[in-house]
Amino acid sequence: MADKHLSTQFDSELNGVSSRVMELGGLVESQIRLAIFALSQFSAESADQVIATEASVNAMEIDIDRELSSIIARRQPTARDLRLLIAISKTTANLEPVGDEAEKIARMVKSIIESGSARSLPASELNVAAELASGLLRKALDAFARLDTSVAVSILKEDDQIDEEFDGFVRKLITYMMEDPRTISASLNLLFVAKAIERVGDHAKNIAECIIYVVKGADVRHSPMAHIESAAK
């Protein structure tokens, strides 16, 4: 009976910390969406809201890490439970930087607005990459909540699209700067925005790899897609 009671407590603690991670995920997802809106509308007000949220993201990361450390020290989990806790830790470590990237986008948007060249920049060219990255993050969070390896594999495949969009945008931006050197400073800010968007996709990919690790016990980092698909079955 005592063992069953301890098991129930442990399950409750696992569910609690998992819920906290999903709460953090929801917060950074809203941050990145607001940052993308700030970019599309060149809205300083929206950018300020993104920046103001960053402190909450950082505080939640610290709370989750503290809770994880406590659970591991007290429960000494094994096998899949331990893998889940490790994955939660790594997922948290990938969500917090998404908040950082959102803040970076917001600050770059404000710099572009202050430069007075917002409307002349090809910011709309980033729309596809931004929506892809935001969508991948949403899929990664949903897949993590359900521990769905098939969705995790699809995320790893789709991340390549964001990389392609980024490369294409860089080529266009270089051409734009060559045609009008006066826009170089503001264009570089837009380049930093593009890189931040690409990194959001990278963090979604990392979360997808964590899902496969929890469910299958396979570390698929830096692995070819054929191996990933086989490991996730």
Language-model features: where?
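Cytosolic, long alpha-helical scaffolding segments
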Residues: M1-K233
